């Protein structure tokens, strides 16, 4: 897998699909979101051009696992049409992330907490899990940011905010491969997203979490 690490000023990660419930039959972009203090749950916005966005003005799913919050929701549609959703389920202290699935974006089932970092009990956080489907291996890849104190050189950040990217893979969201280190760029990093541009051409977009810039 060839990857390029890009730093850009801003990025919005969107999923192109049909917006359920809209009167138009045109394809649209769907934007997953949440409102602070992150206790309401999944919110969605849609756009036909990627520039002008309309809030669907409702909560589609309220989490009940982990610390019962939803931040950083990431959603992908699988080959069978099922929507898979993962999210940050706790600010600090949770050793995993939340998961649920849906066929129509309205009715969600199989909600659970996935304790991907349970084998590292000193882990401070599991933030911003991002989904990617690898059609070549027919597996879902989930990447996220975690801090394990004293695991890496501290650099500019405090020890409890020295983030690195980790990952797991799954075919069915029932069993998950043991979590492994995905990326150590030598500085604190969060909010990474995998984008496939062409066959064997992948891009990794990430946030340099080093203060004060915190650049993408």
Q: Which role does the model predict for each range below?
A:
Residues 9-20:
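Bacterial N-terminal signal peptides
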Residues 22-126, 132-216:
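Beta-rich carbohydrate-recognition and catalytic domains
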Residues 1-8:
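Positively charged n-region of N-terminal signal peptides that target proteins for export
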């Amino acid at each position: 897998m060839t990857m390029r690490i890009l730093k850009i000023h801003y990025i919005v990660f969107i999923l192109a699909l049909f917006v359920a419930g809209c009167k138009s039959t045109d394809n649209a972009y769907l934007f997953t979101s949440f409102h602070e203090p992150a206790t309401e749950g999944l919110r969605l916005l849609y756009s036909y051009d990627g520039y002008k966005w309309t809030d669907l003005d409702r909560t589609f799913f309220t989490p009940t696992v982990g610390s019962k919050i939803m931040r950083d929701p990431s959603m992908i549609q699988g080959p069978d049409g099922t929507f898979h959703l993962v999210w940050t389920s706790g600010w600090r202290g949770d050793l995993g992330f939340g998961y649920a699935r849906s066929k129509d974006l309205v009715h969600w089932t199989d909600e659970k907490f996935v304790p991907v970092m349970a084998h590292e009990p000193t882990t401070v956080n599991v933030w911003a899990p991002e989904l990617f489907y690898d059609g070549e291996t027919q597996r879902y890849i989930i990447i996220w940011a975690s801090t394990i104190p004293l695991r890496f050189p501290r650099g500019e950040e405090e020890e409890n905010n020295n983030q690195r990217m980790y990952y797991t893979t799954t075919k069915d969201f029932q069993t998950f491969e043991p979590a492994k280190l995905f990326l150590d760029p030598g500085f604190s990093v969060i909010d990474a997203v995998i984008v496939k541009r062409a066959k064997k051409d992948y891009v990794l977009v990430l946030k340099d979490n080093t203060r004060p810039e915190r650049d993408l």
